[in-house]
Design a protein with these regions (language model features):
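Betabetaalpha-Me/HNH-type nuclease active-site subdomain
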Residues: 1-83, 156-169
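C-terminal, well-folded lobe of enzymatic/effector domains
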Residues: 79-171
Length: 171
């Protein structure tokens, strides 16, 4: 088993912020024009080919349920999209999920190979690579110059260019 929270540099140092606590209906700061976005989609947890890796790493170290690690508020309306200049998050974003699943597949493949030699080191490396991927996805979603498009009805443009994201994930 890999070291858990607090025992290595990759472990979480702060209390998690649950997704349900961010932009929650009925709270003072709720904005109906914004939606919570999972950088690493929850779909990964139900994808059979990743089950061994995520079982080994654990949900908490990966940060699946922590908005600070794995979340971003994105506009859900055309008006909010125009105001914020961020990708619109309304409805499913299949292409984004496909690209992330592909990147996580590369991480899992490397983890599966490396764990035959040193299981703990393989886990630490996989966590590092998943964190790098989360960081790259966040940066890319926030980059106004090279925007990712999550929704085909996004008023700010269309198209996918994941070249830079590929380079960051492979580094």
């Amino acid at each position: 088993m890999i070291p858990r929270a607090g025992s290595n540099g990759l472990a979480q140092r702060r209390a998690i912020i649950p997704f349900r606590k961010v932009n929650a209906r009925g709270t003072a700061h709720y904005d109906p024009g914004l939606q919570r976005h999972h950088l690493l989609p929850r779909q990964l947890l139900s994808t059979e080919c990743f089950s061994k890796m995520f079982e080994h790493l654990g949900r908490r170290p990966v940060g699946f349920d922590d908005f600070r690690s794995n979340g971003l508020l994105l506009p859900a309306t055309e008006a909010a999209t125009q105001r914020l200049g961020l990708p619109m998050h309304r409805g499913p974003h299949r292409r984004y999920n496909e690209v992330v699943i592909e990147r996580v597949g590369r991480i899992e493949s490397r983890w599966a190979e490396a764990r035959t030699k040193t299981e703990d080191e393989a886990g630490i490396e996989a966590l590092m690579r998943l964190r790098l991927l989360q960081t790259a996805l966040r940066r890319r979603l926030l980059d106004e110059r090279k925007r990712l498009i999550l929704n085909r009805k996004d008023p700010l443009g269309a198209g996918f260019d994941f070249t830079e994201l590929d380079a960051m994930a492979e580094a």
